[in-house]
Amino acid sequence: MIRSRWSVVAIVLAAGVVACGGGKATHGPKAVETGLPPANPLAVQRMVEGVTAAKDPKMQARAIALLNEAIRIDANLWEARFDLGVVLANAGDLAKAEEQLKAAAKIAPEREEVAVALAEVRRRRGESKEAASTLEDFVKDHPGALDARTLLVTALRDAGQHEKAIAQAREVLVRKPGDSTALAELALCHLGRGERDTAQLLVKQSLDVNAKSAIAHRVQGLVHLAGGDDAAAFQAFSKAAHEDPHDTTSRLNMGAVLLRAGAYAKAAEQYKSALAVAPDEPAAQIGLAAALRGESAGKDARMLEEARSLLEKVLERDPHNVAALFNMGVLQADSLKRPAEAKPYFERFLDEAPREHPSRPEAERQVNAAKNAAPAPAAPAPPPAPAPKAGGKT
């Protein structure tokens, strides 16, 4: 659900000027008195200018500069830190986005939009347990914060804590019966436990409530994938993309299905469509790199260089991105035949990736092969595709 939820956060950005200095909130739970001094008027002016610039895709650098200036003038202006965090995250700079959102949360711990944005960034960085911890603390203090609780379901599921995720999804449904998004999230929890029939029933309920729910159609696609029906999954993801053209998650999922099928050129089209909406989306850049690598078959130098450049951009913004590290290692080792240059990427991947990550065995094999004077040739394999997203971007 990343992209759909992130769009909500981005909308909040435009309204961020209404609560300066601990005033009344218009989003999330009611604000409490923060004890902060009144906001510096010049800082507020720069923040407003930054938010205005952020609405123009060509003015992102200007927006970042203005928001940084607002923070320099008034370090306690949490709204500016929140806005800057959202702009940086939308630009793919997740590490710096997390820094700003952590600072905003420290200044304004009662703000739901800040807690949600911080947790979403942590999810996108692969830190699902940290995201869940952030949200668990928040909903404990704010039981009625449904956006935070719904994202908590996703974070817990991503962290493999399906029982806790199911309990939280039911809490959402108690407070908001028949909520289409909560039903779709609950379906994903049951799918994660291997209960595909239950997941299918819940998806049907979600679509009965809202037949145009992009989230529900994406979950339907994942249920089809779990049943081995890639064609039906692709159709469901296509419906999701039709219902929400600005949500790149469905494009990413279609790309992943096409990668699995070896349809590299068509997969590349889907990732390029996602990048047309979100030019710096890391998952789309990594997916496009994998598609180009597959399409090149190790022979098209131009495609391989484009793939390398895409992965390099992701790692420049987030050096800890495990998917980019692994894919760069595979590109260097298998496509460019540079095992010595691949080895550091695989080693960094092994340092960063969770112990249960499915690509760890291959990374370990590559590291061991690079250590040998005459490593055994690797068996040919399709490029690793980004796993279909559960309905995030994001």
Regions found by a protein language model. Give the residues of each.
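Residue-level recognition of tetratricopeptide repeat
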Residues: 51, 86, 120, 154, ...
